[in-house]
Amino acid sequence: MTIKANKKFWENKKVLITGHTGFKGSWLSLILYFLGAEVYGLSNKKNVNFYQFIEDKNIFKKEFFIDLSTEESTKIKKELEKSQIEIIFHFAAQSLVSVAYNFPEETMKTNILGTYKILDFFNSSISAKLLTISTTDKVYKNPSKNNKEEDMLGFNEFYSFSKYMKENLIQLFKLSKLSSNKNINIIRSGNVLGAWDR
């Protein structure tokens, strides 16, 4: 695998990836592992297909399987802090519009409450300094292939609403709670490595 990236930066960095057994999370886990990072994974359950796909079973320094939208998630806070995580990628989400339509409450819990738990851990963590959160291109009031970052945000159904609220939660943390030595980035993407690439 050929990767153009700053290997020196990533070497021995302690990185937590939520949704690490999903599509984006699994690819990022592989890439960061090849760059020399210590990769920690957090997902709500194991994805059998993912473990059949990878050849090296030692990609992860440690894996956690827990639903972030439940009270159980508070149990791993101390364990994550012990790991001295430096960088977090929050990809864990309910990512399907059709599922959100049929199960709106579960979608809200996963996408909003789950994100709150990660933001809260990040803000209280001594070691973590950088958090990147994935939302969606659906957060734009008028989604199109040509959206710009500063375009007006909005929502048209339950899925986009959950991601819109996720972005508002991030901004709220930035304004009211976030320590000055920490940074949060947002990624808004559509379908990745498939139709309608962004």
Where are each of the predicted segments found?
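Short beta-loop-alpha junction of Rossmann-like oxidoreductase domains
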Residues: N142-S144, A195-R198
